[in-house]
Each structure stands twice: as C-alpha cells, then as structure tokens.
Amino acid sequence: MIEPFGNQYIVARPVYSTNAFEENHKKTGRHHKTFLDHLKVCCSCSPQKAKRIVLSLFPIASWLPAYRLKEWLLSDIVSGISTGIVAVLQGLAFALLVDIPPVYGLYASFFPAIIYLFFGTSRHISVGPFPILSMMVGLAVSGAVSKAVPDRNATTLGLPNNSNNSSLLDDERVRVAAAASVTVLSGIIQLAFGILRIGFVVIYLSESLISGFTTAAAVHVLVSQLKFIFQLTVPSHTDPVSIFKVLYSVFSQIEKTNIADLVTALIVLLVVSIVKEINQRFKDKLPVPIPIEFIMTVIAAGVSYGCDFKNRFKVAVVGDMNPGFQPPITPDVETFQNTVGDCFGIAMVAFAVAFSVASVYSLKYDYPLDGNQELIALGLGNIVCGVFRGFAGSTALSRSAVQESTGGKTQIAGLIGAIIVLIVVLAIGFLLAPLQKSVLAALALGNLKGMLMQFAEIGRLWRKDKYDCLIWIMTFIFTIVLGLGLGLAASVAFQLLTIVFRTQFPKCSTLANIGRTNIYKNKKDYYDMYEPEGVKIFRCPSPIYFANIGFFRRKLIDAVGFSPLRILRKRNKALRKIRKLQKQGLLQVTPKGFICTVDTIKDSDEELDNNQIEVLDQPINTTDLPFHIDWNDDLPLNIEVPKISLHSLILDFSAVSFLDVSSVRGLKSILQEFIRIKVDVYIVGTDDDFIEKLNRYEFFDGEVKSSIFFLTIHDAVLHILMKKDYSTSKFNPSQEKDGKIDFTINTNGGLRNRVYEVPVETKF
C-alpha cells in the first residue's frame, strides 16, 4: 500500500534487475491484436455502430436537433449577414489571384459553405476562398495551361463553347476550366484521405512551417496583385524564381501605370487598414466590427459608375456578370495528370489551415473536432465547387473571425452567409459591374496584414527554439525562390531533415547522483553531486538507429575517457608478449610482481604477421597462465598498457524509443568491447518491448546477457556498490547500523552468484 509520509519520498524494496523483477512479479497475458482482429472490428456491424457512423458522417444530425432556436437564431442571422458580405467581397477579390473573372469567386464562396453545413464538424469557421489557396490554384492553372497543346481550346478542357460563355475570352475560359479541374482533383485527394482515415499526414506541417509558408505566400499574393493595382499586362510565370520575373515585368513597364487605378487602390488600402486596426483595438467595445470592406466597395462602385471611370480613365472593372449559375462541367483528365503534385499541396495546405483555425475555436468553445471528417467535408465541398466552375478554398482567417466575433453559434451562420452570396449571384450582381479590379486587389492586400506580421515570429522562435526558427526561415526562402508548390515540398523535406539531424546528433550526457537520493542528473548542472568511484552513467536522449550509432559510440568514448577497443588490442598484444616470456622461462611471478630475466624482447616477423586485427579484437583469455594479470599494475619489461579505473558502465536508455538492425549490431559490438576489458555494462530504463525486440534480433549470447538490464539507474548503482563490496561508512557513517545480513545478488546467470555481507541499510 502506498501511503504519504509528510513531504518525504520513502521507498523500501529489493534491488531489481529486469529478470529478477519479472520472476517476482508475474506479467498478465496480453493479447496483441493482429491485422485480422482489426479487420473483423472494421467489418462488423451493429445498430449502435451504424448510428455512430451516420452521426459521424453527417455531424449536422448531432447538433441540429439540439439547436437553441430562441437563443442562437438571432445571433446566427446577424453573424451570417456580416460573414456573407465579407464572403462576397473576398470571393471577388481572390478570384483575381486565380486570374479568372471575379464572378467565379462567388461560386467558390457559395458551394463549399453549403456542403460544409452538412458534413463539417466546426461550428465557427467560414469555408470559402482563401488567398494562399487561390494563389496556389492560380499557379497550378498557369502550369496546366502552359503544358496544353497550342491549339487546345476551352471545349477540350471540359468547358462547352455555348452562348452563355461567348462573353468570355478564350484564355479566360481555358483558365476557368483548368481551375475547376484542379479544384476537383484537390477535393478528391482530400476525400480519399478522409475516407482512409489518414488525416494525420497534416502533422508533417508544423506550426513554424505553416507560418513561414503562409508569410511567403502572402508576399507572392502581394506581388501578383501589383498588375491590377498598376493595371499592367504581366505574363504568368510558373517556374522557380517566378516572383522575381513578375517584379521585373512590373517595374520594366512602370511608366504605363494607370494613375486612376493606382490612386484608388492606395486610398482603399489605406482606409481599410486603418479601420481594421480600429476594429482590432476596440473589438471589446464595438458590438460588431465595422464592415469597412463592404463600405469601401459600395463607395468605390458608386464613384466609378457616377464618374464613368471606365471610359474616362480606362480603368479595368469587374464588368457584366450574368445572373444565375452556369451549367456544371466535366473535369479534364489531362489536367489531372499535369497538376497532381500541385493538387496534393493544395489539398494539404487547405486542410492544415482549416483544421488549425477550427482547433482554436473547438478549444475555446469546448466541442469535439474530427480531423478526418473535416477532410471529407472540405473534399466534397471542393468537388462540388469545381464541378460548378469554382476554385479550391479553405477558411479565410478574417472571415472566420467575423463569423465568430459577431456572435455566430453554429453553421447556420454559414448558411445565412451563403444565402447572401446567392442573392448577389442571382439578383444584384450587376451593381458590382463598375467596380474597379484595383479595388478588389486592394481588398485582397488588406487581408494579408496578419500573415505579413508573422515576420515577428522569427525573433520569438529564435529565443525559444533555434531549430524551429531555422525551419521558418528556410521555408520562407524556399517558398519565395521555388514557388508555392516546390517550396512547400522542399520545406517539408527540410523539416524532416532537421528531425533526423536532432536525433543524429543527440545531446548525450554523463549523470551523477544528487544529494545522496535516487535522483540522477547531468553532472555539469549541479554542485552536490556524487559519482561512485569507477562507475560511469551515460544517458542517450534519442532513438538509436543507423544514422547515429557512430555518434553514440564517439560520445560514449568521450564520456569514459578511453576507447575500449584500443585498450583491448593493447592488452592482447601485451598478453602475447607475457605468454611468450612465460613459455621461455624468462618470467617469474613473486608476491611483489613480475620478475623478468631479460631486458628486452622483440617480436619476430612471423609473430608480427600473425598480429591480425581480428585476433586482437577477441576476448582476453588468461586461463592457460598460472598467474593473474592485473592490468592496472606494472607489467614486465615496461610493457605499456593504458590503465583504466572504470569497472562499471550504466547506460540510461529511458529515452531510447527504438533500435534498428544496424544500431543493434553496433550496440552489441560496443558492449562486447567493454565486457572484454572487464567493464561491467548495465542498461536501465527500457520497456519490455525493447527487450523483446533485442531477443528477436538474437542480441544475447555468452558475453552479452539479459541480466545486464535493470529497472532504474538507482537499482543498477546499488547493485554495483554491493557487488564491489563498498562499505556504507564511506557514504554516511553516522547512520550505519551494526546489524548485518547475508545478501545474495541473483543475476540470473549474467554474473556469477556471489554472497556479500552488507549492511541492513544501504545509504549514500
């Protein structure tokens, strides 16, 4: 029974090796499930399981019956109207990032929101266009269009050439069809990952990586909108360093800038930025955020229409938008083939952003979130959106913040927002016809402030974790230089490389006892340390595998202060000389040491030829000699063999989670080298699976025995102290007891069973 004794930690138990512990404490027979067992569970069915699956697939069936109509409906309506207005404006603005007509941004704002209502698990995120995703789709579309055959038209891309599309230019129709295909494929990838329950892949996108990537992507968005702000004709670039080519194209024709577009964009951007800052600073006092984007859009459209900016200043405007939705199209398989890599990146970034934002709100409001179901919801939304000519989306941070801050309680707010978008598409879209594209570009840039402010993360990460800081910086550089697709792939690879680097060069340490307790810490960190004479405790804080087994060996040699293999070879060479002297009768043994009747001895050429490395690495065998050799004493003829005081080595493997074949072989070689020079090795802190794995690898033999494993460092240290006949008076003479008992150390064959006379209490 465990009972508290003040603030003291008092434990009385035997010193346990792993073998002794398993003998005294029988293990339960656990049944490890096989693949067939898991398959049976997956394929079995019951009414409860069927209900659980339906509720999981359609989360709306869980929360809609519990909807508090009187308490939540008004809040959801107010939130939905605010979110819908923002969704309309962002849809129009982010369509420019894909380089397609703005009306398709409205489609991208409508369909995903409707699908997410039924399949999503978050109650607060607003699903639709997101600037980073729009930029990635635009680059994928540019790549797909550039790979298409020169005479390829919109019809071959799946867009029928009918009267409804006659107002579109051919290149716009081609880009619309390509964007739809990219969106459908991204949705298929997300849906497949959700069905297969492998949403965990997003864990490879760390917070630092996502922050660096979105910051670099925001810079790409900024550069891509310059052509609309200056109203310049800039060709699309999809190859690496494309951002620099775009900048060159912009500044090489800067003299062609449309001043009316530039001035309008700067005014809108300035006003939007100021009001957004006011919204942020006074969010606790404002009942709802000031809808500055909507206000500026109305003003800009009215001024453009009243002053006839299109004809007077030749500004680029949104233009006529046909009311209603266009018929669905069939995705193009060839576009799938040309953009599969880009689509994978789009799918993963979309999920990572949406899931991270949804996680914040789920923790804040305490409701469950299912990552795999989120993948299904986003995937279905993108598939439907692509079929109806929209483009891939996720959740815009600002739009979700509006939905939550204006009182949104459930996805009913998302439904109201979708209805607002629907009204614009069906009835009042024509009012936006005179709106300048430069205004939409300014609105898009106004939403980048939060992402561009992430540059401040560099200093914070540098102070907290330099590896994370390096990941952020390299992700930013890769994404800027290589583009969004290749940059993301290179960033993930670099991040995984840092993980390998951390485990390949772990911070190994030498431990010692603190304050005569059972606590062992790095001996460099504390003053009151005790290290038993001739005992070294070495800790490795990472897995040991093929990449770091060599580093582990080097650090261990540094810790003990000598190479066991070098000592072994020196001793075997010395033993050959001693054995030769003894056979020739030139060596006598006295109580005071060796007496040699010759002054020197030379190896014959034949003997030197036989001194092969393999022979010198074998265990030292002195059974044929009539005397014992003390390798730390003086040897005859001044034979030089390094003297070592180490007799016991403890390896703390409590942080070693796994070994591979190469590391097992290397570890066994290291242990054999120490054992062959009479250094007892003990391994502590491992779990049962670790030892079972060593058994499967046939790790144990006549030299390396299973009895070297102990439960804790303290168990191993006490075992060594008793085994070496250490007197307790050396540690705490005032607390010694006169009574003594016979204590048997049972090492289960690893070491010879010996009987020691030790004190009743063993204290430091």
Curated annotation (Swiss-Prot):
<dbReference type="Pfam" id="PF00916">
    <property type="entry name" value="Sulfate_transp"/>
</dbReference>
<dbReference type="GO" id="GO:0048240">
    <property type="term" value="P:sperm capacitation"/>
</dbReference>
<dbReference type="GO" id="GO:0005886">
    <property type="term" value="C:plasma membrane"/>
</dbReference>
<feature type="transmembrane region" description="Helical">
    <location>
        <begin position="100"/>
        <end position="120"/>
    </location>
</feature>
<keyword id="KW-0225">Disease variant</keyword>
<feature type="topological domain" description="Extracellular">
    <location>
        <begin position="219"/>
        <end position="257"/>
    </location>
</feature>
<feature type="topological domain" description="Cytoplasmic">
    <location>
        <begin position="121"/>
        <end position="124"/>
    </location>
</feature>
<feature type="topological domain" description="Extracellular">
    <location>
        <begin position="364"/>
        <end position="374"/>
    </location>
</feature>
<comment type="subunit">
    <text>Interacts with CFTR, SLC26A6 and NHERF1. Interacts with PDZK1. Interacts (via PDZ-binding motif) with NHERF4 (via the third PDZ domain); interaction leads to decreased expression of SLC26A3 on the cell membrane resulting in its reduced exchanger activity.</text>
</comment>
<feature type="transmembrane region" description="Helical">
    <location>
        <begin position="198"/>
        <end position="218"/>
    </location>
</feature>
<keyword id="KW-1133">Transmembrane helix</keyword>
<dbReference type="GO" id="GO:0006820">
    <property type="term" value="P:monoatomic anion transport"/>
</dbReference>
<keyword id="KW-0472">Membrane</keyword>
<keyword id="KW-0325">Glycoprotein</keyword>
<feature type="topological domain" description="Cytoplasmic">
    <location>
        <begin position="279"/>
        <end position="342"/>
    </location>
</feature>
<dbReference type="GO" id="GO:1902476">
    <property type="term" value="P:chloride transmembrane transport"/>
</dbReference>
<feature type="glycosylation site" description="N-linked (GlcNAc...) asparagine">
    <location>
        <position position="153"/>
    </location>
</feature>
<feature type="transmembrane region" description="Helical">
    <location>
        <begin position="77"/>
        <end position="97"/>
    </location>
</feature>
<comment type="similarity">
    <text>Belongs to the SLC26A/SulP transporter (TC 2.A.53) family.</text>
</comment>
<dbReference type="InterPro" id="IPR018045">
    <property type="entry name" value="S04_transporter_CS"/>
</dbReference>
<feature type="transmembrane region" description="Helical">
    <location>
        <begin position="375"/>
        <end position="395"/>
    </location>
</feature>
<dbReference type="GO" id="GO:1902358">
    <property type="term" value="P:sulfate transmembrane transport"/>
</dbReference>
<comment type="function">
    <text>Mediates chloride-bicarbonate exchange with a chloride bicarbonate stoichiometry of 2:1 in the intestinal epithelia. Plays a role in the chloride and bicarbonate homeostasis during sperm epididymal maturation and capacitation.</text>
</comment>
<feature type="topological domain" description="Cytoplasmic">
    <location>
        <begin position="396"/>
        <end position="411"/>
    </location>
</feature>
<feature type="glycosylation site" description="N-linked (GlcNAc...) asparagine">
    <location>
        <position position="165"/>
    </location>
</feature>
<dbReference type="GO" id="GO:0019531">
    <property type="term" value="F:oxalate transmembrane transporter activity"/>
</dbReference>
<dbReference type="GO" id="GO:0051454">
    <property type="term" value="P:intracellular pH elevation"/>
</dbReference>
<dbReference type="GO" id="GO:0015106">
    <property type="term" value="F:bicarbonate transmembrane transporter activity"/>
</dbReference>
<dbReference type="InterPro" id="IPR002645">
    <property type="entry name" value="STAS_dom"/>
</dbReference>
<dbReference type="GO" id="GO:0006811">
    <property type="term" value="P:monoatomic ion transport"/>
</dbReference>
<dbReference type="GO" id="GO:0015108">
    <property type="term" value="F:chloride transmembrane transporter activity"/>
</dbReference>
<feature type="transmembrane region" description="Helical">
    <location>
        <begin position="258"/>
        <end position="278"/>
    </location>
</feature>
<dbReference type="GO" id="GO:0008271">
    <property type="term" value="F:secondary active sulfate transmembrane transporter activity"/>
</dbReference>
<feature type="topological domain" description="Extracellular">
    <location>
        <begin position="98"/>
        <end position="99"/>
    </location>
</feature>
<dbReference type="GO" id="GO:0060081">
    <property type="term" value="P:membrane hyperpolarization"/>
</dbReference>
<keyword id="KW-0813">Transport</keyword>
<dbReference type="GO" id="GO:0071320">
    <property type="term" value="P:cellular response to cAMP"/>
</dbReference>
<dbReference type="GO" id="GO:0005452">
    <property type="term" value="F:solute:inorganic anion antiporter activity"/>
</dbReference>
<feature type="transmembrane region" description="Helical">
    <location>
        <begin position="412"/>
        <end position="432"/>
    </location>
</feature>
<feature type="topological domain" description="Cytoplasmic">
    <location>
        <begin position="1"/>
        <end position="76"/>
    </location>
</feature>
<feature type="topological domain" description="Cytoplasmic">
    <location>
        <position position="197"/>
    </location>
</feature>
<dbReference type="InterPro" id="IPR036513">
    <property type="entry name" value="STAS_dom_sf"/>
</dbReference>
